[in-house]
Amino acid sequence: MSEAIRLTQLSHGGGCGCKIAPAVLAEMLKTLPQAQLFPDLLVGHETADDAAVYRLNDEQAIVATTDFFMPIVDDPFDFGRIAATNAISDIYAMGGKPILALAIVGMPVNTLPIAAIQKIMEGGASVCAVAGIPLAGGHTIDAPEPIYGLVALGLVHPQRVKKNSAARAGDVLVLGKPLGVGILGSTMKAGKLDAEAYRQLIDTTTQLNTVGTALGALDAVHALTDVTGFGLLGHLLEICRGSGLSARIEAGRLPLLPAAVEFAKQGIGPGAIGRNLASFGDAVAFDAAVPEWQRRVMADAQTSGGLLAAVAPDSVDEVLALFHAQGFAAACVVGELQAGEPRVGVVA
């Protein structure tokens, strides 16, 4: 089925590479009203956090998010799995536990066979089952390009919400998954991805960030986000701006998908890399020793990427142990946060 119709050829973009560039999005959002009139809204759009959080009572807050995009892979079932995993990740990124999902489905019904659409939806439902939540309904439209995703809802204790704006100077940055998803997606779209590279792509993008719920219970985890369409640098900048801090990243410590390295050195990657780098402007400074391909990897649009945690230095081992125990073998320290103007410096 996926060989007859390549999903990635039906859309102009794929995965979180479809996101509007950070600078453009900021311009679009700047006229929206602030949330001061809603004291129970614990997290709104002000710091570009991963999900909205609304306090229900002293013990519970609801976490609400939506995420959808066009295909990053050709296989319909895998596309559904990736999109669902990516959407649910925003619940974990707030330290929450998912409880419910609704499907968002836009499909070119005159182009794409019903059987393929069914596989996409089945893929999403399979991930909800793994997460232990119902896929309780949703909404469908006839669209010119395939679009799939979820509305995801979760619960978190109001005092355990992990905002991207609560990091502290001296915090150590821990990244949970390797980078390179967008690069492999672009390679696949070009017909150059072998079976092993595809396995790496699917394994990382369908791994639920379940460790976020456990991280939410740790006082030493001060801030949390997931790395998606704006790349590592873009989402780290959101932490810096929200928390009023600067960051230092060591490029040589970054975990990378092995199959993505050579393609990155060839300059392969989604158009979102260039858009992201342009949006960062002088808020990101690279040491001269950092090669161009590594700079691009750090701006690569990740789909269903890893959690990025700002952790008190004396609890780093505990946090890494949590990641590793839940199957995030690549999790490692990649940098630190410091007092200073909101910016990111990258050294070799």
Per-range role (PLM):
Residues 1-348:
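Helix-biased detector of long, well-ordered alpha-helical tracts
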